[in-house]
Amino acid sequence: MNIYAVRLITFSPTHTSKQVGEAIVRGTGISDVARTDLTFHPAGKLEIPESTLTVITVPVYGGKVAPLALERMKDVHASSAPAVLVAVYGNRAYEKALVELDAFASDRGFKVIAGATFVGEHSYSTQQNPIENIKDVVWLKRCLDLKKAV
């Protein structure tokens, strides 16, 4: 399988899932990058070819993938495109969110090749009262480590 492009699909109300996804995409070294941001709008009908690595990043709420993220991705399908799945969680556990995202992506034709979880900024965080408990430098290193594993 030859990979010629990367597509980042993200749902990121606090921008944290998007930041993690962007770091993973940069780590691939692939310059042909398409982005689908589901934060404000659904993806619509989208077919991902086998030659495109897809990075899907979503936040976790209450141990599950944010329901709105799944709703906005429902018309995204793949022809055995490889996928890296990322669940970003805040002050709680991610529980089975990655398993849930794996089932969702697999049902839509993705070939899941990797999954990761990252601790990120909690949705209750504010500039005056940040409750982010991981720094960008650590994220970037983990994103690059994920690239090596893939």
Mark where each language-model region is.
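FMN-binding flavodoxin-like domain, especially the glycine-rich phosphate-binding loop
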Residues: M1-R7, S12-V150
